[in-house]
């Protein structure tokens, strides 16, 4: 698979379960709560630093295997 990349959470809507990550290079990436690794309530906060892999989703590139760093 792809190499891990780093980025920053642009925004995340807890009610809808998705948001966007701004990678260190490239365009913003869609992120779904199912792609967040960890236990419990899966959410991200604006400005959080994250690492992830880029995968092809239904509507283009998106972040997967997201971890807060």
Swiss-Prot record:
According to the UniProt entry, its GO molecular function terms are:
DNA binding; nucleic acid binding
Q: Which InterPro entries match?
A: Cold_shock_CspA, CSD, CSD_CS, CSP_DNA-bd, NA-bd_OB-fold
Concerning what turns on (or off) its expression, the entry says: In response to low temperature.
Q: Which residues form the CSD domain?
A: 7-66
Gene Ontology cellular-component annotations: cytosol
Where does the record say this protein resides?
A: Cytoplasm
- Predominant place of localization: cytoplasm
The parts of the chain that form a coiled coil are: none
Q: Name one Pfam family in it.
A: CSD
Task: Kindly indicate whether the keyword Transferase belongs to this entry.
Answer: no
The record's keywords, sorted A to Z, are: Activator, Cytoplasm, DNA-binding, Stress response, Transcription, Transcription regulation
Biological-process GO terms, alphabetical: regulation of gene expression
What is the designated name of this protein? Major cold shock protein CspA
